[in-house]
Amino acid sequence: MARGGRYGYDNSVSAACRQNPALCAALSGKELAEVGIMVASVGSALQVLDNLTRGSIEQALAECADLARSEVLLRYPTTFTGPIPNSNECNEWTVDAQGNSVTWAMRLGTEMHEVAAQCAQKQLDTLRPGGFSVESRYRYDSRTGRWKQVSPEEERALVESGNQGELRGSLKPDVVLHTGDPSNVLAIYDFKFPCVITDDYKALTKWDTYPTGHPYQGMTQKQMYRKLLGLNDLSGQNIARIVPRWGVVP
């Protein structure tokens, strides 16, 4: 049965009671009904993404991006010639936390993503509880014709068993807003951390294409995200990148 059907109310209350049996044991029938109404109300609110909520979320994500860039750069006060690396320094090689040889652009970008993801999780827990995912992977299910969320446990099991090839062609957006059902995606945001912040806004709006040999070669990440969104992106406005200083970039 579809979510929110005739059993939605009872199941929601039962789930709440399983999580806090002591509380439910003390509630009367009337109070239990009020709990169920509240849960149903929250579920209904997640079915849409109004402009006010979207604006608050995008502002919070932009602040997370700015915070991440500042926090990470402050870790390296004497590494670069100035407070921020120049283009040459961005291309120099270093070693990341896992012992891999990477450029400073890659290392800083990875560290900034980690900080931004933690910040986004905290902010969205308040702004849209139950209606978002951070760094969740999605894989296309050819049997159903839909994209399905891959749980962290399933992803880890595939990697540890040497079957990570099954994840080839999957998508992993930084932030997904959904209806409470992770498969029903309403909006997608990706953090982008250029090593050198450009003043050319037009350059930021260009999405890179997947390279030769990739399952989606020749397509852009935005095009694939639109497939993940399906009918929820008819306007083309539900996919954006979050860039330090610039904020939301479509």
Regions flagged by a language model, labelled:
Residues 1, 27, 155-158, 239:
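Extended hydrophobic/Leu-rich segments
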Residues 1, 249-250:
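Short, solvent-exposed mixed-charge patches
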Residues 2-152:
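Nuclease catalytic cores
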Residues 127-184:
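Active-site metal-binding core of divalent-cation-utilizing nuclease and nuclease-like domains
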Residues 166-173, 178, 182-248:
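Mg2+/Mn2+-dependent nuclease catalytic core
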